[in-house]
């Protein structure tokens, strides 16, 4: 089988490595891929948002199955175009991808179908937003751009001044373009956060092992929000009891709601949850695998990934028994100095002996190949994942490998998994 994976990050690298385990897979192509993916697949220099370019390539190469991993091409409708050419895909249609593509849509969906989430209001006029925030006078308050914003469109304002700045940034300065035409103002929830990725064929929902993300750039959850600086799995706060409650009140109701709206969702549906004192609530939906959550979840998957993806496409997921290893995984992201703001590129990476460490996989994100060497090309450069019998073992191995990797201005958080370990001690 010839497989095409669309995307260029650590998530795509993790997907490709897992797909390679299936003996039926003869060739894997990545559009556009990166320096590390090039060792596991043939990289083709076509941007993930060049829908025509990808479609032409897929048709020309007689691709048997395509995995569309990032949010942008999903929201733009790449799956619909490829399917119309007879190429089966893993990923939601354009109509279904709106669950991530518009926060206004997803909040209204939850309200209509009684899915637990934070209280909210929607605005399209900056003046109205500001007078609403002033009148409520409740801080912190959460301000979200409606559309896609590379994971950076959510601002938590601690004061009226910060709220004004956020509204100006999103709605007037148009930092995220048309994504900021509308904003959602949400109540601030408290409690541990949990990421749950799930496979769904629009009928059955199979939650994957839970994970815990670390969004802030610096140790102690300080610094700016990022796309994610590391993850651990499973998430110790997510007990069997809570999982059952989420399945009944959130996961299945969401999939049924999408069916009712004639937007059947097939693919990976990501639930960003907060375990509040009043029970689990949805903070966000994503229409695809999370990054770097995928880098800890897929290494723990026992069942063949391609088999699952084909079952999702064929709507036969209920016939599969999807299993995960009874182990833990940890991923430490190594980033370029200055990330998530401006950073240098093109620095050569010295991997030391990291890639030969037992139970470790180094997933490439912002890397490129230059003159036979691997160099930095993005903000989040590598994700170092380790598995182990428990979280302590996984973290210790991941950090042992991380310490061996060197490039100019590299930095990583030293406290990935600290909250999870503290929760386990309780």
Residue ranges: model-predicted function:
Residues 43-49, 121-125, 157:
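Short acidic-hydrophobic, aromatic-tinged amphipathic segments that line or gate anion-handling sites
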Residues 90-153:
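A conserved helix-loop-beta module that forms one wall/lid of the active-site cleft
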């Amino acid at each position: 089988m010839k497989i095409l994976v669309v995307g260029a990050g650590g998530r795509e690298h993790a997907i490709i490595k897992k797909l390679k385990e299936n003996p039926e897979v003869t060739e894997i192509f990545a559009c556009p891929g990166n320096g590390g993916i090039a060792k596991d697949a043939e990289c083709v220099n076509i941007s993930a948002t060049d829908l025509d370019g990808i479609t032409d390539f897929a048709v020309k190469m007689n691709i048997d199955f395509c995995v569309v991993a990032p949010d942008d091409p999903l929201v733009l409708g790449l799956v619909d175009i490829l399917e119309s050419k007879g190429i089966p895909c893993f990923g939601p249609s354009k109509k279904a991808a709106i669950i991530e593509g518009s926060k206004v849509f997803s909040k209204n969906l939850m309200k209509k179908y009684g899915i637990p989430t934070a209280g909210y209001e929607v605005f399209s006029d900056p003046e109205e937003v500001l007078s609403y925030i002033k009148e409520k006078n409740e801080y912190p308050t959460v301000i979200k751009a409606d559309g896609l914003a590379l994971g950076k469109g959510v601002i938590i304002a601690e004061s009226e001044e910060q709220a004004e700045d956020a509204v100006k940034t999103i709605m007037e300065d148009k930092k995220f373009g048309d994504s900021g035409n509308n904003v959602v103002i949400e109540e601030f929830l408290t409690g541990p956060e949990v990421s749950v990725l799930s496979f769904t064929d629009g009928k059955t929902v199979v939650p994957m092992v839970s994970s815990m993300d670390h969004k802030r750039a610096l140790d102690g959850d300080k610094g700016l929000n990022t796309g994610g600086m590391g993850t651990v799995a499973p998430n110790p706060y997510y007990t069997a009891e809570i999982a059952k409650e989420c399945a009944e009140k959130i996961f299945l109701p969401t999939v049924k709601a999408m069916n009712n709206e004639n937007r059947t969702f097939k693919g990976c549906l990501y639930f960003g949850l907060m375990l509040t004192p009043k029970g689990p609530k949805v903070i966000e939906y994503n229409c695809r695998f999370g990054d770097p959550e995928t880098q800890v979840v897929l290494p723990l998957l026992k069942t063949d990934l391609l088999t699952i993806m084909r079952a999702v496409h064929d709507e036969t997921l209920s016939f599969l028994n999807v299993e995960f290893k009874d182990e833990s995984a940890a991923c430490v992201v190594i980033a370029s100095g200055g990330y998530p703001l401006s950073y240098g590129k093109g620095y050569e990476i010295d991997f030391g002996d990291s890639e030969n460490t037992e139970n470790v996989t180094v997933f490439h994100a912002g890397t490129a190949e230059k003159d036979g060497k691997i160099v930095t090309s993005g903000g989040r450069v590598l994700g170092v994942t380790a598995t182990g019998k428990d979280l302590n073992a996984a973290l210790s191995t991941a950090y042992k490998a991380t310490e061996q990797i060197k490039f100019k201005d590299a930095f990583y958080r030293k406290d990935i998994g600290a909250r999870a370990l503290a929760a386990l001690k309780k």
